[in-house]
Amino acid sequence: MDTLHGELVLGMMNRIVCRGNLLKSSFYSSSRIGYSSIYDTGSIRSFTSTGILSNSKSKLTGGGNVDGNKGNNGNEDLLKGFKSKLDHSKDLFSKYKSLLVKNIDNVKEAIREANRKFAEQEAQAGVDSKLSYNKDVSTGGVIGGLPSEREIRRRKWSRRLEFYLDSLQETIFSASKAFNDVTGYSSIQKLRKSIDLLQIQLEVMKRELKTLRVDYEESIEKRINSQRQVNELLQRKSSWSATDLENFTQLYKDDATNSKREQDLKTELKNKEEAQEKITDELYSAILTRYHEEQIWSDKIRRTSIWSTFMLMAVNLFLFVILQLFLEPWKRRRLVRAFERNVRTSLEAQAADHQLHYEQLNAQLQEQSRLIQQELEMEKFKDDKRKQDEPQTPSTIWGWFLQLINKLQNLSPMDMNCQTNFNTLQIYLLVTSVGVISSILTTLIS
């Protein structure tokens, strides 16, 4: 097989070299023809410039319609080609869409079938009741995390995975086949099978050729031997016996038969060699086509992977830009608002607590001040009473009277909300003085 591949590669290289030489010679010949045609057209243009100028009006009038019709026809052809390509693309899209939907339905059906089989197996398996004791006697609860439970869960998931793989095997095969159909690798696989069949046919043809060559050489040897025996008999023709005559006749017949067989084998060998050459040429062409198609397929897959990578990078870049320009500021504002809301709530709660504490403290202080004021008033009342009980001198009474005058001077007759404290003696003096003054005024008036 290695020698066969080596021969095939050498044959392909020779063909490529021959084709390259042919292309080179055709290129040189075409280039020479092109140069001569350029020179010829240049001379023709130089000689016919006046004719072009004289016929310019006719071209502008009559040729414009022709060019316009050609342009319209070209546009119509382009539209038809575009429509045909669009229809072909729509057909391919609908075909691949139906294949995708079919594969998705197959996957769903396979998963449902795997779940059904797994549920049936779990229902049939059961658990040994003697090995399922998990009660904690000291606390009355359930003992969890036993190794048997973990092992049961592991086995359950492994069996489920096996069911999924078994059920999805056909779906995966059909999906891979559909992918190969989409990418065109199925045709390459058919071409590989054709190459394998051609190699097998070539091997069979080589074995048949080898057998034919052996038979052809044997027929030649038989013919040579029969001719030698005939020549030996002809040399002693004068002394033939009846047996020699029979041998000569038989040898002559055998020689004719051997000659005919040799000719038939030669013809068959020539046909087989031509068939082998044809199969070899087909094999060379198939291998070259396979390498060429695989190269195109790999380039297409590589190009698709590169573009898909670029698309993913573009999507990631777009998402990054969207995230940085819109989502991150929105998230930041949302966090700031939430933080401000929390801070405001906490500050309001703290302010309410402080206000409540301040009100309680203020109430306590007012209560204490009220109690202190009451105590002071009681003490003052006791002092006044004690002073009233004591014998008073005229100087003391005169001092009280001066204090009353000072308080009266501090009072403003226009201010009705002013407050002043008077003790009992001062009130008595005030009433007495008012009575004396009023009596004096009445006497004066009367």
From Swiss-Prot:
Q: Which UniProt keywords apply?
A: Coiled coil, Membrane, Mitochondrion, Mitochondrion inner membrane, Transit peptide, Transmembrane, Transmembrane helix
**Coiled coil located at which positions?**
186-285, 344-390
Membrane topology, from the record: Multi-pass membrane protein
Task: Name a single GO cellular component.
Answer: mitochondrial inner membrane
Q: Where found, per UniProt?
A: Mitochondrion inner membrane
The record's InterPro entries line, in alphabetical order, gives: MDM33_fungi
For biological process, the GO terms are: inner mitochondrial membrane organization
Judging by the UniProt lineage, the source's domain of life is Eukaryota
Q: Does the keyword Membrane apply?
A: yes
**TM segment ranges:** 306-326, 425-445
Report the protein's function: Required for the maintenance of the structure of the mitochondrial inner membrane. Involved in mitochondrial morphology. Causes growth arrest when highly overexpressed.
Question: Which family does the entry's similarity section mention?
Answer: Belongs to the SHE9 family.
Q: How does it assemble?
A: Homooligomer.
Q: What protein am I looking at?
A: Sensitive to high expression protein 9 homolog, mitochondrial
Q: Which organism is it from?
A: Vanderwaltozyma polyspora (strain ATCC 22028 / DSM 70294 / BCRC 21397 / CBS 2163 / NBRC 10782 / NRRL Y-8283 / UCD 57-17) (Kluyveromyces polysporus)
This chain is encoded by the gene named SHE9
